């Protein structure tokens, strides 16, 4: 049985194109595999703990800085529970709108919580990072209202898909498909662009 984790990064519900496209992809996958297990993670409804003093200090113990104590261990247990949910997925699906050239802050918060040594990555002083999540894949729907590939710099920059590509590579997920719906506000026929993205996702 395949487990799919759908991460909802837009707060706009049914008005969000990234949500709608990701939903269509998940529905198509369900139609192809009746045993597919889908876990929906709405980052705007989830109670994500602050990654502040204790969890940050606990993380540093893996790099030889400081020591665990009961307070740090409690904070780290909360981090581990959230991270294990992500690690349990065979296929990660994200619908990600572009916010100010980057990703929504709730998604960055989530990534900062789960990107932990010994769980998502290893680190060696001589060889750098090594991703620990193997034999998994990801499908990422990226949307924007203004920026598009090849656009003049006056229309923004992409720290959106580029960041996510780097992050997936860092944690070991190299089978990543990006489907873009960009831009949605400046084209003469935005519906045609949406339909192309939808066709690519439902045919996958």
From Swiss-Prot:
TM segments?
none
As cofactor, the record names: FMN
Q: Cofactor binding mode, per the note? A: Binds 1 FMN per subunit.
- What keywords sit in the KW lines? Flavoprotein, FMN, NAD, Oxidoreductase
Catalyzed reaction equations:
2 a quinone + NADH + H(+) = 2 a 1,4-benzosemiquinone + NAD(+); N,N-dimethyl-1,4-phenylenediamine + anthranilate + 2 NAD(+) = 2-(4-dimethylaminophenyl)diazenylbenzoate + 2 NADH + 2 H(+)
The EC number(s) given in the record are 1.6.5.-, 1.7.1.17
Q: Which domain of life is it from?
A: Bacteria
Q: Tell me where the signal peptide lies.
A: none
Among the Pfam families in the record, one is Flavodoxin_2
Q: EC top class, in one word?
A: oxidoreductase
Q: Does the keyword Oxidoreductase apply?
A: yes
Q: Which GO terms describe its molecular function?
A: electron transfer activity; FMN binding; oxidoreductase activity, acting on NAD(P)H as acceptor; oxidoreductase activity, acting on NAD(P)H, quinone or similar compound as acceptor
Q: Where does FMN bind?
A: 10, 16-18
What is its quaternary makeup?
A: Homodimer.
- What does the protein in this record do? Quinone reductase that provides resistance to thiol-specific stress caused by electrophilic quinones. Also exhibits azoreductase activity. Catalyzes the reductive cleavage of the azo bond in aromatic azo compounds to the corresponding amines.
Tell me the protein family, please.
Answer: Belongs to the azoreductase type 1 family.
PANTHER family, per this entry? FMN-DEPENDENT NADH-AZOREDUCTASE 1 (PTHR43741), FMN-DEPENDENT NADH:QUINONE OXIDOREDUCTASE (PTHR43741:SF4)
What is the name of the protein in this document? FMN-dependent NADH:quinone oxidoreductase
Instruction: Please name the source species.
Output: Ruegeria pomeroyi (strain ATCC 700808 / DSM 15171 / DSS-3) (Silicibacter pomeroyi)
């Amino acid at each position: 049985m395949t487990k799919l984790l759908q991460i909802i990064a837009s707060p706009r519900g049914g008005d969000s194109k990234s949500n709608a496209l990701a939903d269509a992809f998940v529905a198509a996958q369900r139609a192809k595999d009746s045993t597919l297990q889908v876990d929906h993670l709405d980052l705007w409804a989830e109670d994500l703990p602050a990654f502040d003093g204790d969890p940050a200090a606990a993380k540093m113990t893996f790099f030889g800085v400081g020591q665990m104590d009961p307070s740090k261990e409690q904070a780290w247990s909360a981090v581990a529970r959230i991270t294990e949910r992500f690690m349990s997925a065979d296929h990660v699906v994200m619908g990600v709108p572009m916010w100010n050239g980057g990703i929504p802050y709730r998604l960055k918060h989530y990534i900062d919580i789960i990107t932990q040594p010994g769980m998502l990555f290893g680190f060696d002083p001589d060889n750098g990072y090594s991703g620990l999540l193997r034999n998994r894949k990801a499908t990422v729907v990226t949307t924007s209202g203004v920026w598009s590939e090849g656009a003049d710099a006056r229309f923004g920059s992409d720290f959106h898909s580029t960041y996510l590509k780097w992050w997936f590579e860092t944690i070991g997920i190299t089978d990543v498909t990006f489907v873009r719906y960009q831009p949605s506000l400046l084209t003469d026929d935005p519906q045609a662009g949406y339909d192309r993205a939808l066709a690519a996702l439902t045919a996958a």
